[in-house]
């Protein structure tokens, strides 16, 4: 169970880092938002899901 928690935390950190870089780039590009809107929403949904997963796994471990 601990390894699943560690992998979920790593995935959350990696997703946060990717979104931290990609979202401002998408908003700064001229046609970026219209062409990459679905990717940003998918990344945000993944991040929210990982936050809940880490919270659930943390409650099971502690």
UniProtKB/Swiss-Prot annotation:
Location in or out of the cell: Plastid, Chloroplast thylakoid membrane
Membrane-crossing segments per the record: 8-28, 41-61
Keyword set includes Amino-acid biosynthesis: no
Pfam families xrefs: Ycf9
Protein topology in the membrane: Multi-pass membrane protein
GO cellular component: chloroplast thylakoid membrane; photosystem II reaction center
Keyword Chloroplast: yes
Biological processes per GO annotation: photosynthesis; photosystem II stabilization
Keywords recorded for this protein, A-Z: Chloroplast, Membrane, Photosynthesis, Photosystem II, Plastid, Reaction center, Thylakoid, Transmembrane, Transmembrane helix
Record text on subunit structure and interactions: PSII is composed of 1 copy each of membrane proteins PsbA, PsbB, PsbC, PsbD, PsbE, PsbF, PsbH, PsbI, PsbJ, PsbK, PsbL, PsbM, PsbT, PsbY, PsbZ, Psb30/Ycf12, at least 3 peripheral proteins of the oxygen-evolving complex and a large number of cofactors. It forms dimeric complexes.
Role, per record: May control the interaction of photosystem II (PSII) cores with the light-harvesting antenna, regulates electron flow through the 2 photosystem reaction centers. PSII is a light-driven water plastoquinone oxidoreductase, using light energy to abstract electrons from H(2)O, generating a proton gradient subsequently used for ATP formation.
Family (UniProt): Belongs to the PsbZ family.
NCBIfam families registered for this protein in UniProt: PS_II_psbZ (TIGR03043)
Name of this protein: Photosystem II reaction center protein Z
Organism of origin: Gossypium hirsutum (Upland cotton)
Name of the gene encoding the protein in the UniProt record: psbZ
